[in-house]
């Protein structure tokens, strides 16, 4: 078990990204997408194993979800890493994702960056992005990353940017609306209720 980065209050990166992944898995149901998660349980996979899963699956795109950490505990912000900026669709996806996630946390959009050194970007055969969802080393970011509505919001913007990337139609959410209807003979009774 590799906890990944660990916050001041002992929040584990692995737990946060697993929660985002599980939420995203639910949100993607009902779309015309074949999705493969490298993990939906607390099982450790090496970076090379993750790349191999994506390559064996022959994925069109690969997204790796992470939480950043820095020695300077004041640092906050969201960034997305790509191997190169040669794929316009991936660039649009990464820029949108970076902006949308930064807005959730009211954190700095640190932008889309390139690296040929990150294992999952270097070893995947498809366009790949790695998102760093804020800095767990910042106590306020760590707190925000423990709020379930923020986890849901991150999963939702990942879903929405994936939908946009593939040009898919949004499906109606399976929200159950409850309606209470009152019938009144006298309008004043309705107003006074």
Predicted regions mapped to residue ranges:
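Active-site-adjacent mobile loop/cap segments within catalytic or ligand-binding domains
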Residues: 2, 11, 57, 61-75, ...
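Envelope-exposed proteins and targeting segments
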Residues: 31, 76-78, 127, 175-177
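Sec-exported extracytoplasmic/periplasmic mature domains
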Residues: 22-33, 55-59, 98-106, 150, ...
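Solvent-exposed beta-strand motifs enriched in subsets of small alpha/beta binding domains
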Residues: 171-193
């Amino acid at each position: 078990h590799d906890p990944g980065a660990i916050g001041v209050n002992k929040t584990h990166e692995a737990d946060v990204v697993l929660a985002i992944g599980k939420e995203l898995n639910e949100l993607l149901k009902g779309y015309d997408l074949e999705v493969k998660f490298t993990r939906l349980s607390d099982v450790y996979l090496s970076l090379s194993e993750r790349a191999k899963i994506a390559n064996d699956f022959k994925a069109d795109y690969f997204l790796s979800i992470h939480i950043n950490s820095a020695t300077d505990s004041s640092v906050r912000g969201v960034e997305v890493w790509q191997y190169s900026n040669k794929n316009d669709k991936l660039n649009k996806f990464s820029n949108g994702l970076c902006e949308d996630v930064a807005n959730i946390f009211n954190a700095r959009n640190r932008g889309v960056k390139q690296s040929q050194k990150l294992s999952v970007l270097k070893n995947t055969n498809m366009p790949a992005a790695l998102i760093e969802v804020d800095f767990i080393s910042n106590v306020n970011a760590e707190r925000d990353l423990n709020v379930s509505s923020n986890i849901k919001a991150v999963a939702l913007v990942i879903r929405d940017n994936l939908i946009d990337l593939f040009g898919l139609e949004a499906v109606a959410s399976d929200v159950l609306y409850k309606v209470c209807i009152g019938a009144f003979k006298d309008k004043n009774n309705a107003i006074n209720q």
